[in-house]
Amino acid sequence: LNGNLIMPGFKDAHTHSAMTFLRSYADDLPLDKWLNEKVFPMEAKLTDNKIYEYSKIAIKEYLTSGITANFDMYISPDPVIQASVDMGFRTVMTGGLNDFTQSVPEIEECYKKYNGYNDLISYELGFHAEYTCSEGLLKDLSALANKLQAPVFCHNSETQKEVAECVKRYGMTPTVYLD
């Protein structure tokens, strides 16, 4: 061990492992255009096998950087979780619930399926962001969170435009609206 350092592994608290293939893809765009015009259309074409393979690539990258656990949000949790299990990697997973790819019953099913599934895996409730979820969807998720006594995770106030548009829609910031 001469000249080396032994320390606990790092934890990455915000990952989207399956999105490794999008690194540097149209990254000169503002977030809303990048998501709506580039990311969401590309993700719609992904198969579970591709999501699994991209997640394995991400996990290999995490490990080479000293990251031994992550908190991952993705719309297709099954292949991400399988990649984590197959790689022996600790993952806290949350779904990317939104109005166009997932439903509250699917999130509940994942919560029940993956908590206790494997010692390396846990699943938390989550949604993508205020601007991709209707009020009704958020209320349904809130009811589920209360039923399960579980926390809820999301992206919040990532850009000035997001905050301004939420204030325009609801007369309050995303943080106040989501409270």
Task: Tell me the role of every PLM-derived stretch.
Residues 79-179:
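Metal-coordinating catalytic core of metallo-dependent amide/deamination hydrolases
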Residues 1, 13-15, 71-73, 156, ...:
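Generic detector of well-ordered alpha-helical packing
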Residues 1-7:
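Histidine-rich, glycine-flanked metal-binding segment
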Residues 6, 23-88, 108-117:
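Alpha-helical scaffold segments that flank or form the walls of functional sites
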Residues 8-20, 151-160:
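Histidine-centered catalytic micro-motifs
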Residues 18-19, 32, 175:
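A general structural signal for well-ordered alpha-helical segments in protein cores
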Residues 3, 14, 22, 66, ...:
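Divalent metal-coordination and catalytic microenvironments
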Residues 16, 75, 97:
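Flexible loop residues that form catalytic
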